[in-house]
């Protein structure tokens, strides 16, 4: 039959669609979960069994009166449904004719800041909800600050519950003016404001007749058309090596994800930290070879020369190098329920690199509600200074055991971000966004990297290579040793 559904063609077409990752944030009862539920409902992306369950749950535990409680599509935890709030990050996937979406519904409470950081770490766009009755409040400012901290370039201010202010243009303009005045110094390049009613569906999927004064497009139309391709850094080639692939003696490839930039066959690349160069022989994928690769593609690169490269090292263009250093400043969010121990060292995971690190100084803490910088005397950590607690944000100085290869987070999110790992519990203690390198001349005397002087060992020179191989494996596991021949 001519009308028979071609499943392969449908899947191929769906695979070619662009993917937009977005998060929603707002105060309690601003309607985040209701908005996403309405988006799924009106775009006909729910199955019949989901609709039946939604109707049953709305009558049993819903908070929308006689209406369907669309928030129940997102609020999955029992505690969330009982309290009518979002606690965990809820993810939902759906697609339209124009694009695929992954939505992270993040909690609005201050005590769940780490959940919002987690949900927004991969987002291209943020929807900040405000209640038309209350306007821009402290939580709105906090969420917007966190969005700017994460480097999200596109923000939608969704002024919800417009039906409760009679769809007043004057009220909408007042909220927009106040918000744009606040957001301007944060440096978010793309801010759009949409009046809507999530419960009734106004301006969610289709334009509403109840806002004739609004000349923009609906929320879904905006999400389908917002341009995100330029958000990637296509200038600075960075290829953190994740795995060395050697299936046989005739093939040696370096696997990983292109973090930024573009690499082509024949390009000259440099391996860091060795500084050795070679040319790209081939770019291999599961579907065959490519002439070039770009972010966020995962590929295997083969080189014309046999140079020593292992996991944690990086391939770059020799005329465009990242910062190579052990000392840097960063904005850091504390994620562990255990307060920061000033005497503890951590593992730092940055791209595929792993090293030991210590926190040398806290420049200041940030009050996420007022944006105020809370300074710490001389920037030094002492027992008299309260260490970082769960969800607190600070500008810190770190020193790593071995050199890292990084760019500022604002320039390159992939190579400018890191996590700290507690070496005892393996918990993620903190996440960070690198600002820049920092001079640490005053701390040179406290350099605690152990030194191995091969000339002082009673070992034949032919065994030095084996020792260096062991040292390199220790470095790969985050334990640095300086070798002197």
Swiss-Prot record:
Its EC number is 2.7.7.4. Keywords: ATP-binding, GTP-binding, Nucleotide-binding, Nucleotidyltransferase, Transferase. Residues 160-163 are annotated as: G4. Residues 197-199 are annotated as: G5. GO terms for molecular function: ATP binding; GTP binding; GTPase activity; sulfate adenylyltransferase (ATP) activity. Residues 26-33 are annotated as: G1. It catalyses: sulfate + ATP + H(+) = adenosine 5'-phosphosulfate + diphosphate. GTP binds at residues 26-33, 105-109, 160-163. The keyword ATP-binding applies. Pfam families: GTP-eEF1A_C, GTP_EFTU. Pathway: Sulfur metabolism; hydrogen sulfide biosynthesis; sulfite from sulfate: step 1/3. Heterodimer composed of CysD, the smaller subunit, and CysN. This is Sulfate adenylyltransferase subunit 1. It comes from Bacteroides thetaiotaomicron (strain ATCC 29148 / DSM 2079 / JCM 5827 / CCUG 10774 / NCTC 10582 / VPI-5482 / E50). The gene is cysN.
């Amino acid at each position: 039959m001519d009308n028979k559904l071609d499943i392969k063609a449908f899947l191929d077409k769906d695979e070619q669609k662009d993917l937009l990752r977005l998060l929603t944030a707002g105060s309690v009862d601003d309607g985040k979960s209701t908005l996403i539920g309405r988006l799924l409902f009106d775009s006909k992306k729910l199955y019949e069994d989901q609709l039946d369950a939604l109707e049953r749950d709305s009558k049993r535990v819903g908070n929308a009166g006689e209406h369907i409680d669309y928030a129940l599509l997102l609020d999955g935890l029992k505690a969330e449904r009982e309290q009518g709030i979002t606690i965990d990050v809820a993810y939902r996937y759906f697609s339209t004719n124009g694009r695929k979406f992954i939505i992270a519904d993040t909690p609005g409470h201050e005590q769940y800041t780490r959940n919002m950081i987690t949900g927004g770490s991969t987002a291209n766009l943020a929807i900040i909800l405000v209640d038309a009755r209350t306007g821009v409040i402290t939580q709105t400012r906090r969420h917007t600050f966190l969005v700017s901290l994460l480097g999200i370039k596109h923000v939608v201010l969704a002024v919800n519950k417009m039906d409760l202010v009679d769809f007043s243009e004057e009220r909408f303009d007042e909220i927009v003016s106040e918000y744009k005045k606040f957001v301007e110094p944060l440096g978010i390049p793309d801010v759009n404001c949409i009046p809507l009613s999530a419960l009734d569906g106004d301006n969610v999927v289709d334009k509403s007749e109840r806002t004739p004064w609004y000349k923009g497009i609906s929320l879904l139309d905006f999400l389908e058309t917002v341009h995100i391709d330029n958000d990637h850094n296509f200038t600075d080639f960075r290829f953190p090596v994740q795995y060395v692939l050697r299936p046989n003696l005739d093939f040696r490839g370096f696997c990983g994800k292109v973090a930024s930039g573009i690499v082509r066959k024949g390009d000259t690349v440099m391996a860091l930290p060795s500084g050795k160069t070679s040319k790209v022989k081939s770019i291999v994928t599961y579907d065959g070879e490519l002439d070039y690769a770009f972010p966020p593609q995962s590929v295997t690169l083969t080189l014309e020369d046999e140079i020593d490269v292992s996991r944690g090292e990086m391939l770059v263009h020799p005329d465009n190098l990242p910062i190579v250093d052990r000392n840097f400043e960063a904005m850091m969010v504390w994620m562990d329920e255990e307060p920061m121990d000033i005497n503890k060292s951590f593992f730092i995971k940055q791209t595929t690199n792993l090293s030991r690190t210590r926190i040398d100084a806290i420049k200041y803490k940030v009050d996420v509600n007022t944006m105020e910088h809370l300074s710490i005397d001389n920037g030094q950590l002492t027992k008299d200074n309260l260490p970082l607690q769960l969800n607190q944000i600070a500008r810190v100085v770190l020193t790593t055991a071995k050199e890292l290869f990084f760019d500022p987070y604002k320039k390159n999110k992939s190579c400018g971000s890191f996590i700290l790992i507690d070496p005892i519990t393996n918990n993620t203690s903190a996440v960070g966004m690198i600002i820049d390198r920092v001079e640490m001349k005053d701390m040179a005397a406290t350099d605690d990297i152990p030194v191995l002087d091969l000339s002082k060992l009673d070992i034949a020179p032919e065994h030095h290579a084996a020792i260096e191989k062991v040292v390199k494996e220790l470095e790969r596991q985050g334990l640095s040793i300086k070798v002197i021949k």
